[in-house]
Amino acid sequence: MTIEVVQADHFRIPLPVVLSDSTHGEMSHFGLVTVRIHCANGQQGLGYTYCVGDIGGDAIRSLLERELAPLLIGSDASAVESLWERMWWHLHFVGRGGIAAFAMAAVDIALWDLRARVDGKPLWRFLGGEDPHVAAYAGGIDLQFTLAELEAQTRGFLDAGFRAIKMKVGRDDLGEDVERVKAMRGWLGPDIALMADANMRWSVDEAIDAARALRPYDLTWLEEPTIPDDVEGHARIAREGGIPIASGENLHTVYEFQRLITAGGVAFPEPDVANIGGITPWLAVARAAQAKNLPVTTHGVHDLQVHLLAATPNASYLEVHGFGLDRFMPEPLVIEEGMARAPNRVGHGVDLDWESLASHRAPRE
């Protein structure tokens, strides 16, 4: 399967409501960068990545077009792992994460999609999965929601079939966070899983104080309590805070995950396939977690990552993220009784409506 064309496209997708967290502030749109790989035999694979507020979207598209497309054209598309290594070392001096990992992710996802399509299997089954069902939670991006808005969102999530919900914390006043988490637990009762996400808002000491204050509300995990670079800080929060820690959406290499896992700084490693370099390194993170008897969860791009968790023996929850593409997909992800179901369509099964997306094409800068 010789690669003939690597087509990159960049879109700016408006959000139906303004979302908010403690780091990125208010978000009205996100960037979507897609890659379509066309082979000489007519086969095609699709990959994509995304960025908050479309920061970096044009740079990712440019990197794909100027560096990765010329590197890949003429190569055998079935050699997925070796092509990943080639991209990694080609971009190593300026990469090792950052926008390079986003660009590599879009390509790697497209190659795995192509590989599964050629084999005639859905991606989850191609990767060795037996059951397409994965426990899922609704990821609220709701830090500035009023309590009434938070309750309305929660009712909507429950009505949509979710049996686990994540909310944002990290307001200026810790007392407000406690009040909101207490209210959420009251609405949910004891049987619905509740997670809280601080988006790196706190120092280590502040995170420990927050974890201790939130401990009475039976959180499944506290996510990103501090900056991802502070590995020892994460370990200390895990030891002293009393709540399991989830982290990883801002870790863009396998090596960063290995350090955090080895240090005891995370109970739920949380790779995002769209920013860690794709499926190839995502699977390596899942194996590293399994070796330490840890479950792996996800961040973002749920339509892709449902396949990965369905094929992973140490799978935890799938995040169903607010940056969804449902309106551009004829068959969005199905949620029933708290479980997401990976589709049985060949490849990853994401079939985008390119005509609808066309009106959101980003201008070239």
Predicted region positions:
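N-terminal basic, low-complexity leaders that serve as flexible interaction/assembly modules and, when applicable
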Residues: 1-70, 357-365
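Conserved, mostly hydrophobic/aromatic
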Residues: 3, 42, 68, 107, ...
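N-terminal small/glycine-rich loop or linker at the start of catalytic domains
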Residues: 118-142, 180, 189
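Metal- or metallocofactor-binding catalytic centers and their adjacent structured scaffolds
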Residues: 5, 38-118
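Catalytic core of soluble alpha/beta enzymes
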Residues: 167-299, 308
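Active-site mouth loops of central-metabolism enzymes
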Residues: 133-149, 198-203, 246
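Flexible C-terminal active-site loop/helix
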Residues: 1-15, 27, 32, 299-365
